[in-house]
Amino acid sequence: MSDHGRMHIPESGLATPAAAHSDDPPHPHFNRRVTSFRARRSTISDAQQATWDRLWPELGRQVRDGDAPAGRLDTTPAGRLDTEAWFGRHAPVVLEIGCGTGTSTLAMAQAEPDIDVVAVEVYRRGLAQLLSAMDREGVTNIRLIRGDGVDVLTHMFGPDSLTGVRVFFPDPWPKARHHKRRLLQPDTVALIADRLRPGGILHAATDHMGYAGHIAEVGDAEPRLRRIDPDDAGLPISTARPVTKYQRKALAGTEVAELLWEKTTP
């Protein structure tokens, strides 16, 4: 474990009316499959709702939901996200799957103003907190998608389109009977590898060592990815996460595994 509480897993041959707005996750209409997120209810404040109403039409998208306007999202290959039009510039794009309340998302975007970040989260409350922080801090290089990360990868991005994919502290689903719900499975990692451009980075972090071993095994088994060290120089995106509540746990003695791969082949 490093001075920052990071643990490197050795390469293996193994493993979202005012205060009562609902936060039910969107229905996964695209893929009738086991999902990695849990059902959850929460609310957003009046102030957050006001910010949402003002900014979401410009800065947010929804994969699909029973309440989504018809035609809001064209999911044909020709209708994938036009990130240059959305951000208003040509820049490398990083996709963060499961941004939570956006603490890392905001800080890393502020540190890399030349990188465009698309943050995906199922739960509206987390996106509302991030949207309010973006507004307060004047951060312009983040866009938000509410929905399932696998649906986003499948329908909204094409091959070789991403400079980075970040998956920080995904639900470990620790019980053996729930392991099938884990986000980072072979099929998902293969999809990520397809969407990364050559030289692009997959960066995963977890404080659950059982899941870390699983992620290591799955990532190392993907032939288009090569394990790299988080401190390697010359990477196209930063791998320095801010000190979040998860990092504070690490400094208190809970190890955090940082796992990175580079896409080496098309």
UniProtKB/Swiss-Prot annotation:
<keyword id="KW-0808">Transferase</keyword>
<feature type="binding site">
    <location>
        <position position="121"/>
    </location>
    <ligand>
        <name>S-adenosyl-L-methionine</name>
    </ligand>
</feature>
<keyword id="KW-0819">tRNA processing</keyword>
<dbReference type="GO" id="GO:0043527">
    <property type="term" value="C:tRNA methyltransferase complex"/>
</dbReference>
<keyword id="KW-0949">S-adenosyl-L-methionine</keyword>
<dbReference type="Pfam" id="PF02390">
    <property type="entry name" value="Methyltransf_4"/>
</dbReference>
<dbReference type="GO" id="GO:0008176">
    <property type="term" value="F:tRNA (guanine(46)-N7)-methyltransferase activity"/>
</dbReference>
<dbReference type="InterPro" id="IPR029063">
    <property type="entry name" value="SAM-dependent_MTases_sf"/>
</dbReference>
<dbReference type="InterPro" id="IPR055361">
    <property type="entry name" value="tRNA_methyltr_TrmB_bact"/>
</dbReference>
<keyword id="KW-0489">Methyltransferase</keyword>
<feature type="binding site">
    <location>
        <position position="148"/>
    </location>
    <ligand>
        <name>S-adenosyl-L-methionine</name>
    </ligand>
</feature>
<feature type="region of interest" description="Disordered">
    <location>
        <begin position="1"/>
        <end position="32"/>
    </location>
</feature>
<comment type="pathway">
    <text>tRNA modification; N(7)-methylguanine-tRNA biosynthesis.</text>
</comment>
<feature type="binding site">
    <location>
        <position position="207"/>
    </location>
    <ligand>
        <name>substrate</name>
    </ligand>
</feature>
<comment type="similarity">
    <text>Belongs to the class I-like SAM-binding methyltransferase superfamily. TrmB family.</text>
</comment>
<feature type="binding site">
    <location>
        <position position="175"/>
    </location>
    <ligand>
        <name>substrate</name>
    </ligand>
</feature>
<feature type="binding site">
    <location>
        <position position="96"/>
    </location>
    <ligand>
        <name>S-adenosyl-L-methionine</name>
    </ligand>
</feature>
<feature type="active site">
    <location>
        <position position="171"/>
    </location>
</feature>
<feature type="binding site">
    <location>
        <position position="171"/>
    </location>
    <ligand>
        <name>S-adenosyl-L-methionine</name>
    </ligand>
</feature>
<comment type="function">
    <text>Catalyzes the formation of N(7)-methylguanine at position 46 (m7G46) in tRNA.</text>
</comment>
<protein>
    <recommendedName>
        <fullName>tRNA (guanine-N(7)-)-methyltransferase</fullName>
        <ecNumber>2.1.1.33</ecNumber>
    </recommendedName>
</protein>
<dbReference type="InterPro" id="IPR003358">
    <property type="entry name" value="tRNA_(Gua-N-7)_MeTrfase_Trmb"/>
</dbReference>
